[in-house]
Every structure is written in C-alpha cells, then in structure tokens.
C-alpha cells in the first residue's frame, strides 16, 4: 500500500494496529479520501490523515449521516454506533469532519464509518473542537493550494496510563481518548514547497 503522502504520521508495525486508506472521486479522478492508523484492540483510530482543498469541500451534497461499518476493517474490531454511544456526555466525534467532504456522496459517507469516530466529550465536540474545524476549513485552507491535516487522539498519556472504556451499541468496549491534536502542513504550487502551519 502507498505510504508516501506528505502528512502521514508514524506507521506502527504492532499486530494490533492496521493502516488503511480510503479513496473517492474528485474531478472524475480516483484520489485518496483519507488514511488512518487504526487500533484493532481499543477500537479507534490513533490518527487520521487527509488532504483538504476546495475540490473536497465544494458543497455538492449535504451531510449524509450514513453511519456504517468501515468495509476495510474487521467488524469485530469496530464499535457499532448506529445510535451513538448510549451514554450521556459523549458524542460520535468525527476525526475527519463531515463538512470537509461535501464534493460527493461517496466522500461524505466515508466520514461516517465507525472507524472515523471517537468517544468525544460533547462539550468539546460541539464547542472549541467544532470552532477549530471551522477555522481550519474556512480560514486556513484558502491560504494554500492544499492543506494536509492529521487529526489524532490518545487514550494514554505519560501521566495517566489508565484507559477508560465506553460501550458501543452491541456492548463493544472502545477506549475513550484523553486528548486530541491536529497538525497542519500547507502546500502552495508556485513555490513547490511545504510549510508547517502549526500544531494545534
């Protein structure tokens, strides 16, 4: 599989980790939708990497809400999230936002795979995290030809190695992330150079 995209984070060779890429169609061409490093044991993606440009965000379709299993990951390694987490205070938080993929139904539907979700604190998901996603899409993406984004989550930190879990619709245990991050890399064609935009 291809791993040469500029924004990809470190790949893991652990048996419990699986690297997956999803593709879509942009301007009648098959292109990458996003890539992920998925934790088969804890049932969430440690990071999701994706390109962001006007070709992907052009509003040709509406939010699909096509909640479904990821066809590239074994079902028994995914949480089932048709009805959310079933616990107050947690949302099905997208790592790749639905609003970043409105160019076609296929692009948007893939953002509703259960593997793109984490158990995200509702206040965070609907508050500062949503504002951050909007800022990246509306203010930072237009500054370059392509903005490469990595969104990540961690269920352990140096200070806290204990992992909390939450249940999916059929009782599957999924790790609850303790922290999230985004890393941005912008590419502008005239200079053919990459510039680090920042770590958020």
Question: Over which residues does each language-model region extend?
Answer:
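Domain-level detector for secreted/extracellular nuclease and nuclease-toxin modules, and
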Residues: 1-200
């Amino acid at each position: 599989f291809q791993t040469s995209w500029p924004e990809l984070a470190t790949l893991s060779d652990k048996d419990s980790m699986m690297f997956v890429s999803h593709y879509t169609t942009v301007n009648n061409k098959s292109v990458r939708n996003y890539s992920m490093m998925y934790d088969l044991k804890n049932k969430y993606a440690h990071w999701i990497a994706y390109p962001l440009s006007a070709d992907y965000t052009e509003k040709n379709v509406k939010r699909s809400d096509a909640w479904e299993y990821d066809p590239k990951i074994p079902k028994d390694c995914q949480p089932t999230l048709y009805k959310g987490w079933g616990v107050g205070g947690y949302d099905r938080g997208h790592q790749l936002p639905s609003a970043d993929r409105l160019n076609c139904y296929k692009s948007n539907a893939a953002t509703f795979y259960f593997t793109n979700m984490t158990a995200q604190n509702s206040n965070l998901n609907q508050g500062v995290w949503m504002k951050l996603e909007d800022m990246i899409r509306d203010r930072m993406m237009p500054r370059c030809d392509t903005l490469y984004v990595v969104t990540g989550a961690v269920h352990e930190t140096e200070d806290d190695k204990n992992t909390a879990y939450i249940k999916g619709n059929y009782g599957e245990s999924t790790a609850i992330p303790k922290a999230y991050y985004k890393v941005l890399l912008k590419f502008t064609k005239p200079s053919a150079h990459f510039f680090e935009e920042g770590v958020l």
